[in-house]
């Protein structure tokens, strides 16, 4: 479903070398990563189709020409709905599971599609770009995109940076609480310590921001699981909440109550399995 986009503007930030981040004001859509150079443009995620004109104008302002590739980190609309509007003549690179989820939606499909299962690499604008799959975390199929020479990593919704927003795990779409924790732990051991990280939402961050999120995941999930083991129902757990140091995390679009519900439902799901 497309949110109200009235008044939304696209902000552009130069990250490193050929890499830029395009952000929609008000956090109505996922952050776009863009490699802009002599080979053309490679986009990571595409936000919503009604924002395509603004996105194209922003790319033009930084010297961008033709969009050669679009990579989707996962299938959610706020990261894929602009595929067709932006990339009519582009090649779409997606994980095979993501392709299954979007292939019947004309807004999200392109004529030229390349799928992969575990990892895909390409050379573009003078550097190697690695697309690495992480299963059953935020959704059934998430990928990160590593711009090696630029030392920038787009991690999609496996991370919402800053102490603003708890994560969201789409259990109905194959995501899992434990999988998200495992994925974040794996990313911490995969990417360079000095890498700049483009998150799915909010501000650019670094390994310290990712580590902070990892610590939050371990502690808050542990709190809810212990209370489940004590026989407390979800309403009681929501009432008791988290320690005060996490108050600010609930100010984004995923509040503490929703995150508790996410953990609770995910924990019961894993128990029933």
Describe each region flagged by the PLM.
Residues 13-57, 145-147, 151-155:
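Conserved beta-strand hairpin/beta-sheet module of binuclear metal-dependent hydrolase folds
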Residues 39-40, 65-68, 89, 127-129, ...:
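Loop/turn elements at helix/coil->beta-strand transitions in domains of secreted/extracellular proteins
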Residues 2, 189-196, 203-273:
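Accessory terminal helices/loops
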Residues 18, 35, 45, 59, ...:
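Divalent metal-coordination and catalytic microenvironments
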Residues 25-26, 37-39, 46-50, 74, ...:
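A mature extracytoplasmic/lumenal domain signature
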Residues 9, 14, 40-41, 48-50, 96-219, ...:
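Metallo-beta-lactamase
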Residues 50-53, 57-123:
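Active-site HxH/HxHxD metal-binding segment of metal-dependent hydrolases
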């Amino acid at each position: 479903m497309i949110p109200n986009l009235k008044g939304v503007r696209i902000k552009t930030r130069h990250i490193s070398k050929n890499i830029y981040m395009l952000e929609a004001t008000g956090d109505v859509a996922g952050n776009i990563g863009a490699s802009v150079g002599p080979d053309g443009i490679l986009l990571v995620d595409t936000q919503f189709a009604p924002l395509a004109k603004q996105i194209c104008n922003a790319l033009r302002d930084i010297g961008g020409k033709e969009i050669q590739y679009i990579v989707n980190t996962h299938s959610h609309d706020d990261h894929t709905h602009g595929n067709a509007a932006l990339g009519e003549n582009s090649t779409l690179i997606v994980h095979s599971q993501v392709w299954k989820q979007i292939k019947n939606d004309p807004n999200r499909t392109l004529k030229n599609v390349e799928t992969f299962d575990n990892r895909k690499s390409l050379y573009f604008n003078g550097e190697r770009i690695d697309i690495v799959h992480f299963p059953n975390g935020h959704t059934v199929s998430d990928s990160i995109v590593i711009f090696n020479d630029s030392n920038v990593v787009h991690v999609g919704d496996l991370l919402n940076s800053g102490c603003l927003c708890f994560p969201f795990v789409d259990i109905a779409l194959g995501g899992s609480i434990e999988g998200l924790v495992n994925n974040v732990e794996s990313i911490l051991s995969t990417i360079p310590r000095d890498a700049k990280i483009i998150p799915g939402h909010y501000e650019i961050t670094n390994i310290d921001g990712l580590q902070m999120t990892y610590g939050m995941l371990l502690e808050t999930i542990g709190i809810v699981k212990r209370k489940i083991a004590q026989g407390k129902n979800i309403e009681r757990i929501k009432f008791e909440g988290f320690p005060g140091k996490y108050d600010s995390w609930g100010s984004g679009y995923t509040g503490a109550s929703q995150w508790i519900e996410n953990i609770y439902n995910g924990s019961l799901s894993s128990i029933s399995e």
